[in-house]
């Protein structure tokens, strides 16, 4: 959640938030399994629902998934050597590396996940790993440069938001954040982390990205505010799916 959520629920401690998340998942799974009553008591959560139940009207009953035992659980990863990646490996959850994370940090996610899984006798395939990235294929590299150089552009605004949220969360800035002063850093982040350019350039950048982070099963393309460039984005997704994806699939199979 956002730092504003942390304050709202009086939970500013990162460790307790992480453990509460784990307990929340455990409680949900338990409720999916339980037939009639719902009880869960952990270090951070104490949940009970036994009295105010009227099954005929669906009151006090949780909807249970059709998929058994339950749908796969996925978690997002950000930090290098992420403890969440370790937890996901132990639990068999789907790891998803964030699109706003640099490639060097992402490169630590799968090894951390795999090592944790192997410690309990599992041998996961990298096909399970999903990696997020912001990708835009333009008609030319010059068009890509114009988009990245726009101080009010979609990618600048995206990282302006993320950078500001991160500063609030770190506690180093308080509420004193001058958004105008944050624009240069947001533009730099966009240029560092967004994969944008002509079809050939994007293909080359994605291959370099794979060389850095290692093989993965799914590339998740991040959605952005398309604004007046709806057709550009539609063309980009189409080119990515029909032309570039097969190249990347072949590259991973041949190299790894």
What kind of region is each of these model predictions?
Residues 1-256:
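Active-site-adjacent structural elements that line small-molecule/cofactor binding pockets in enzymes
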């Amino acid at each position: 959640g956002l730092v504003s959520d942390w304050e709202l629920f009086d939970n500013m401690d990162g460790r307790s938030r992480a453990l509460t998340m784990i307990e929340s998942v455990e409680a949900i799974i338990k409720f999916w399994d339980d037939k009639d009553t719902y009880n869960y008591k952990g270090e951070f959560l104490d949940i009970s629902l036994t009295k105010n139940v009227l099954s005929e009207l669906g009151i006090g009953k949780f909807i249970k998934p059709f998929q058994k035992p339950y749908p796969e659980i996925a978690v997002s990863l950000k930090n290098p050597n992420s403890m969440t990646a370790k937890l996901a490996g132990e639990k068999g959850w789907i790891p998803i590396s964030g699109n706003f994370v640099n490639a060097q940090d992402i490169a630590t996610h799968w090894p951390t996940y795999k090592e944790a899984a192997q410690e309990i006798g599992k041998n996961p395939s990298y096909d399970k790993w999903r990696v997020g990235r912001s990708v835009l294929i333009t008609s030319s590299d010059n068009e890509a440069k114009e988009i990245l150089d726009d101080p009010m552009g979609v990618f600048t605004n995206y990282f302006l938001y993320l950078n500001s949220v991160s500063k609030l969360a770190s506690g180093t800035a308080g509420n004193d954040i001058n958004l105008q002063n944050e624009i240069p850093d947001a533009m730099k982040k966009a240029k560092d982390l967004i994969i944008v350019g002509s079809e050939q350039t994007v293909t080359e950048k994605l291959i370099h990205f794979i060389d850095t982070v290692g093989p993965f099963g799914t590339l998740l393309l991040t959605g952005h505010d398309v604004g007046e460039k709806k057709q550009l984005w539609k063309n980009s997704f189409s080119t990515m799916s029909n032309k570039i994806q097969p190249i990347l699939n072949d590259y991973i199979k041949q190299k790894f």
